[in-house]
């Protein structure tokens, strides 16, 4: 029971996969359901980013940027921007895992507890929206990019207008925060040491190997072997940091969708229901089961990738579970002794609904052009 509470999405995906097996008996054809390229890319990126985090690169960059801040708005803007831009390369999950605890530390040291909730909420929104800009920003983008055979330029082009709008909205939201003078020095930040040059070059090189596969310079087995061999030699403990539950969730949904596609009556009905309604379907389904499984489920019954991308990325706004990355921020805040979880949820819901309404309107306008 505790596992179900901890991993509700994986549990639901596993149940759906098992139930679908009663209608389509297990066979070697199941292997054709699995998108091994997406799984290999996710695994490799999670491993390499774990290495970059382990050597302290992100905290070092963050503390370097924060040194010399003179106002609360400047501080809030920098902390929010860190999540917005870093999520484009290291995923929304890793961005929040790295910078939300870092922000809590900084705000406590600066004596600004009143900024804790609005800043963390804005960081969460920033990571979810910033991550939609690139193929590797979040799992749903990586999957749809791979599954639909998009080029990196196509995906970036599709998402650029919404990304620019979200950046402007975040700037406006930060500007509405109460401003006052502060002083943050390098000493007060306890700035992390710069990562060693050899480790930095090693992990950045591996990150470039991943990007090479993303833009299809070489096949995924080549990338997977290089990452596996290099990390085994350098630091095999990084394999423990990989989110294997996320990978299993993908596998379960692949099996469920593959089986549904082999049942003509169900496949035909779902295609009819979803076709032409990918954007609202993505937004609404994300509110209930989160945007990664929503992307996997809906992708099996439509060829319209642009509205689907819009739907599952904008759909990351709204409820706490609309994007599982949002849960990361909430847990980090809720663990604080002085946490006001009720207030957090009120602010989170208010900010998210405002962003969701504006982004949905923008999405509709872009799709109707």
Language model features with spans:
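Short, hydrophobic transmembrane alpha-helix segments
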Residues: 23-34, 369
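Membrane-core helix-loop-helix motifs of multi-pass transport proteins
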Residues: 111-179, 185-188, 331-361
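C-terminal transmembrane helix pair
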Residues: 156-167, 280-369
């Amino acid at each position: 029971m505790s596992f179900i509470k901890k991993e509700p999405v994986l549990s639901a995906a596993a149940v759906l996969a098992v139930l679908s097996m009663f209608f389509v008996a297990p066979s070697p054809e199941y292997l054709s359901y699995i998108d091994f390229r997406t799984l290999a890319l996710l695994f490799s990126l999670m491993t390499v980013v774990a290495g970059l985090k382990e050597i302290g690169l992100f905290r070092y960059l963050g503390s370097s940027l924060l040194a010399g801040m003179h106002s609360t708005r400047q501080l809030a803007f920098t902390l929010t921007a860190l999540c917005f831009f870093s999520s484009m390369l290291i995923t929304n999950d890793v961005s929040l895992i790295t910078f939300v605890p870092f922000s809590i530390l900084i705000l406590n040291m600066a004596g600004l507890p009143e900024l804790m909730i609005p800043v963390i909420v804005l960081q969460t929104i920033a990571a979810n929206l910033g991550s939609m800009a690139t193929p590797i920003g979040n799992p749903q983008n990586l999957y749809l990019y791979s599954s639909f055979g998009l080029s990196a330029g196509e995906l970036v082009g599709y998402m650029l207008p919404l990304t620019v709008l979200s950046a402007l909205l975040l700037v406006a939201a930060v500007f509405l925060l109460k401003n006052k003078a502060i002083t943050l020095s390098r000493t007060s930040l306890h700035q992390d040491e710069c990562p060693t040059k050899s480790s930095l070059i090693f992990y950045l090189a591996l990150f470039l190997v991943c990007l090479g596969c993303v833009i299809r310079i070489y096949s995924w087995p080549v990338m997977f072997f290089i990452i596996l061999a290099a990390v085994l030699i350098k630091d095999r403990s990084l394999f423990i940091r990989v989110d294997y539950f996320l990978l299993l969730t993908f596998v379960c949904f692949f099996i469920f969708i593959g089986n549904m596609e082999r049942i003509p009556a169900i496949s035909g009905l779902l295609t009819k229901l979803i076709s032409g309604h990918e954007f609202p379907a993505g937004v609404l389904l994300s509110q209930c089961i989160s945007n990664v499984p929503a992307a996997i489920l809906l992708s099996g019954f439509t060829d319209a990738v642009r509205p689907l991308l819009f739907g599952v990325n904008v759909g990351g706004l709204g409820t706490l579970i609309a994007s599982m990355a949002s849960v990361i921020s909430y847990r980090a805040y809720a663990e604080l002794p002085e946490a006001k979880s009720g207030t957090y949820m009120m602010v989170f819901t208010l900010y998210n609904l405002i962003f969701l309404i504006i982004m949905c309107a923008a999405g509709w306008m872009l799709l109707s052009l």
